[in-house]
């Protein structure tokens, strides 16, 4: 061939783009291979599509994407038998930005779909003229030799990515494209077959076009499965296939508790295949609070960081695949597109509806309770974080209760409320056994008022955010007992509580500023004292958490409530009326109340000495004495 080499300057926008792609756009260098493989698969699909009306363009039977590393030459070659490019195509697609031909092809695709239906649609991945430039992240120089299907001419495009490119005639036996990357010194890993295999399986395992890797001995190994399970009709998928795929995406060994497989059609089209595990993961779910549902576009894996589900559904695994997202410059920035936001809402609604349906299935209540034991704490985070979804999440929650032996729900609690009861009561502590034995429950038990027992790490946060359920306010039992005055204890005697004005005044004086008030209460039965809050700020458990986190608490000090019918309180009242100094005893009472609530004494040593002194006094009494 006598034609001379042609040198061209990149369009002004390409120079800027190259710098952006190489230095800023992609967060992971391995994405270059995803882009080039996607382009090769795109070209193969385009040739298959055009062959529908031109048999001369038919793909060879062994059509595939071939990846061939050469350590000696320090090159990596990606070859395909796709539609190929002419000289003009190379100049337009690789010399100017956003001229991949995909846009024009999409128009032809729309026309063909109107004529022949959806089954004739090939899968197009991205805009070739953008993703291609990612090759310069790992290559000092890139050459592209291509022959357009239906043409005898081949051309080579070459560039070092620094402002210009060359075009010259070439030879290629069959239509298709060879992209040769002359690798940078720090990109040796991409000349290793095992590394290439890992990248292909990660990003392109489900692309329909076969992908092979040729090793140093010339042996080719398949690198992708080429089957997108979620794209198959549900009727063609066995339970074992679902299980196998679940274990692949979740890296778990259990079976899915729930499988959601659906196709959304209409203004927004996507396919979802999601799984709810039947077991907790081995690693705590607090370590990474983001959803890891995988986003695919036309089978190509894009990212598992698109946050397709909110954090409070991060236990769900699976895939969402759509044809409605463009793959342009910034695949890492897909999160901000309106289409993806709509997909997020639709997928979240689907998962909530599935959980709601299962939560209402009384025949399988134990199965749902097991799910909630595994993932309930995560689900509760949604009440705190997701204002829009709170009303939908609340009925999904399950609780231990002071009156029910098993689990109960908010709707069931409301249905059992006493006519005079105004609020949904709850108590928060670090474990269920401490809750069951809490002095805070005595008055409620005596009146048979049910209290929800909350012991998860998030339980101190979400009730205040929910506020109310079915117009019933949620109220911590440590924040007052408004309803108890309207409810008499069952079997209550007519014994009147003694007046304790002198003792109350003495305790207030002795305990300032550690308590904001001292008052008698009718919500204690067996215990002498209990702590409460004013009802205007965080409950006691939240205050403890804030202190443990070193954040302190700027609100008022707790209220010390005393039981006027308890022998210890009556004895202290007599001593107060006799004029004794009760400062030490007052401190011990406050520490006793703190210990009852799972907190530590203000001064553990002083508290231990007070208890030892009390025990010594008891031991000194003669046997049988009062």
Swiss-Prot record:
Region (C): 545-626
Domain of life assignment: Bacteria
GO cellular component: cytoplasm
Region: A, residue numbers: 1-331
InterPro entries: HATPase_C_sf (IPR036890), Heat_shock_protein_90_CS (IPR019805), HSP90_C (IPR037196), Hsp90_fam (IPR001404), Hsp90_N (IPR020575), Ribosomal_Su5_D2-typ_SF (IPR020568)
Gene (name only): htpG
Family, as annotated: Belongs to the heat shock protein 90 family.
Keywords for the protein's UniProt record, in alphabetical order: ATP-binding, Chaperone, Cytoplasm, Nucleotide-binding, Stress response
Keyword Cytoplasm assigned: yes
B: annotated segments: 332-544
Coiled coil, from the record: none
Protein's cellular compartments: Cytoplasm
A GO term for molecular function: unfolded protein binding
HAMAP family noted in UniProt: HSP90
Name assigned to this protein: Chaperone protein HtpG
């Amino acid at each position: 061939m006598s034609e001379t080499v042609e040198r061209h300057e990149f369009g002004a926008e390409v120079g800027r783009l190259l710098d952006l792609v190489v230095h800023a756009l992609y967060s992971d260098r391995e994405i270059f291979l995803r882009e080039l493989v996607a382009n090769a698969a795109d070209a193969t699909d385009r040739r298959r599509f055009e062959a529908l009306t031109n048999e001369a363009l038919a793909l060879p039977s062994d059509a595939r994407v071939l990846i061939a590393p050469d350590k000696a030459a320090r090159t990596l070659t990606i070859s395909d038998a796709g539609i190929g490019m002419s000289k003009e195509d190379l100049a337009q697609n690789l010399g100017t930005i956003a001229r991949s031909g995909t846009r024009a092809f999409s128009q032809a695709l729309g026309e063909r779909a109107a004529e022949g239906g959806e089954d004739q649609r090939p899968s197009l991945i991205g805009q070739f003229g953008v993703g291609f430039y990612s090759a310069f992240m790992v290559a000092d120089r890139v050459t592209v030799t291509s022959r357009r299907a239906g043409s005898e001419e081949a051309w080579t495009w070459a560039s070092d990515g620094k402002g210009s490119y060359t075009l010259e005639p070439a030879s290629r036996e069959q239509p298709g494209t060879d992209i040769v990357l002359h690798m940078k010194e720090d990109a040796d890993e991409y000349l290793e077959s095992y590394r290439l295999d890992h990248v292909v399986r990660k990003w392109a395992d489900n692309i329909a076009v076969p992908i092979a890797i040729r090793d140093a001995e010339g042996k080719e190994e398949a690198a992708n499965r080429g089957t997108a399970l979620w794209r198959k009709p549900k009727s063609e998928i066995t339970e074992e296939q679902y299980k196998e795929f679940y274990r692949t995406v979740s890296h778990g060994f259990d079976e899915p508790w729930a499988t959601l497989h659906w196709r959304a059609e209409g203004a927004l089209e996507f396919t979802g295949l999601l799984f709810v595990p039947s077991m907790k993961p081995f690693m705590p779910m607090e370590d990474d609070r983001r959803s890891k549902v995988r986003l695919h576009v036309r089978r190509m894996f894009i990212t598992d960081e698109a946050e397709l589900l909110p954090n409070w559904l991060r236990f769900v695994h699976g895939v969402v695949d759509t044809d409605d997202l463009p793959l342009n410059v910034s695949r890492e920035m897909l999160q901000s597109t309106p289409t993806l936001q709509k997909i997020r809402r639709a997928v979240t609604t689907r998962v909530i509806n599935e959980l709601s349906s299962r939560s209402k299935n009384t025949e399988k209540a134990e199965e749902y309770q097991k799910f909630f034991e595994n993932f309930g704490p995560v689900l509760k985070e949604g009440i705190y974080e997701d204002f829009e979804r709170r009303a939908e999440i609340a009925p999904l929650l399950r609780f231990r209760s002071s009156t029910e032996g098993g689990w109960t729900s908010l709707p069931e609690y409301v249905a059992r409320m006493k006519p005079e009861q105004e609020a949904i009561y709850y108590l928060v502590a670090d474990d269920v056994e401490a809750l069951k034995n809490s002095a805070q429950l005595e008055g409620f038990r005596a009146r048979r008022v049910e209290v929800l027992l909350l012991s998860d790490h998030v339980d101190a946060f979400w009730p205040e955010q929910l506020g109310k359920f079915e117009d019933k306010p949620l109220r911590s039992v440590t924040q007052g007992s408004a309803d108890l005055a309207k409810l008499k204890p069952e079997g209550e005697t007519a014994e009147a509580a003694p007046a304790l004005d002198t003792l109350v005044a003495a305790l207030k004086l002795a305990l300032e500023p550690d308590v904001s008030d001292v008052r008698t209460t009718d919500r204690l039965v067996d215990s002498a004292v209990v702590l409460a809050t004013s009802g205007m700020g965080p409950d006691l458990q939240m205050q403890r958490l804030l202190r443990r986190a070193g954040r302190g608490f700027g609100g008022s000090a707790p209220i010390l409530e005393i039981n006027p019918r308890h022998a210890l309180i009556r004895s202290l009242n007599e001593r107060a009326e006799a004029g004794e100094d009760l400062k030490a005893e007052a401190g011990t009472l406050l520490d006793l109340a703190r210990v009852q609530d799972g907190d530590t004494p203000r001064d553990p040593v002083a508290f231990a000495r007070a208890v030892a002194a009390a025990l010594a006094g008891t031991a000194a009494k003669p046997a049988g004495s009062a």
